[in-house]
């Protein structure tokens, strides 16, 4: 098999990275994708750094053994902790994801920018470096959201439980003063509609899925690795939990409008 026809690997701590996979498939409809969700060990955002590194390495090896030509680490926590190590250890294009703070700043709406993310993402040096670029001129507030990925892993993406969780998190803010909400975890786009409801649709909601997918396409094009055959690609999903329910949920989220 030529390298152009090999699949693209996607990895996340669970089902969250499917939000990025959806964007990538829209942008690269001829490509085949292999998605590995580590729901057995989710969430990563409250684990120790060394544990996240080991789990990420295991997932990467799983996908490498399936012959992928590129890897998207569709997990903010894993990106912040392991992306440099992965690029040193594997000789394929590796694309990570980080909170889309730059697009939020470039909107120039002038209000508060809230970054929803896991505690580990917000505690890592990679995030601190990102904050340093803008904190002098922008009103940016990190908002740790422990427990939210776990709800989404159970398939709870709407209804009273999600509404009340978000209502509690945003109760300290004046919705009129929020200009943007950055979704700093790939699980969060699945609760975007409820987030709009809680914040009365006042804020612009931004995630990094499109930017990451665009970077994937750019790197594949520059390396002459894009698939040339004119056909519709396919998506195959694996999960460390190895049960039908989590696979069914994964495909349901992938097909969610």
Swiss-Prot record:
Keywords: Cell shape, Cell wall biogenesis/degradation, Isomerase, Peptidoglycan synthesis. Its EC number is 5.1.1.3. GO terms for biological process: cell wall organization; peptidoglycan biosynthetic process; regulation of cell shape. The active site is at residues 75, 185. It is an enzyme of class 5 (isomerase). It catalyses: L-glutamate = D-glutamate. Substrate binds at residues 12-13, 44-45, 76-77, 186-187. The keyword Cell wall biogenesis/degradation applies. Provides the (R)-glutamate required for cell wall biosynthesis. HAMAP family: Glu_racemase. NCBIfam families: glut_race. This is Glutamate racemase.
């Amino acid at each position: 098999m030529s390298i152009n026809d090999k699949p693209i690997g996607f990895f996340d701590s669970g089902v969250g990275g499917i939000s990025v996979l959806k964007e990538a498939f829209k942008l690269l409809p001829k490509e085949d994708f292999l998605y590995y969700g580590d729901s057995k060990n989710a969430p990563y955002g409250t684990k120790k750094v060394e544990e996240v590194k080991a789990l990420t390495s295991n997932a990467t090896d799983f996908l490498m053994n399936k012959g992928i030509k590129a890897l998207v680490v569709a997990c903010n926590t894993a990106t912040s902790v392991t992306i440099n190590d992965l690029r040193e250890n594997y000789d394929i294009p590796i694309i990570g994801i980080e909170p889309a703070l730059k697009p939020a700043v470039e909107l120039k709406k002038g209000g508060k920018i809230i970054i929803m993310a896991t505690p580990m993402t917000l505690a890592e040096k990679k995030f601190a470096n990102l904050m340093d670029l803008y904190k002098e001129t922008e009103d940016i507030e990190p908002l740790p959201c422990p427990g939210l990925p776990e709800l989404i892993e159970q398939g709870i993406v709407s209804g009273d439980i999600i509404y009340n969780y978000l209502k509690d998190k945003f109760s300290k803010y004046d919705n009129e003063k929020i200009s943007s909400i950055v979704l700093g975890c790939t699980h969060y786009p699945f609760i975007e509609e409820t987030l709009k409801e809680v914040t009365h649709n006042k804020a612009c909601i931004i995630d990094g899925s499109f930017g990451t997918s665009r970077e994937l396409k750019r790197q594949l094009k520059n390396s002459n690795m894009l698939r040339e055959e004119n056909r519709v690609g396919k998506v195959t999903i694996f999960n460390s939990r190895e049960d039908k329910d989590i696979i069914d949920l994964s495909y349901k989220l992938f097909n969610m409008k």
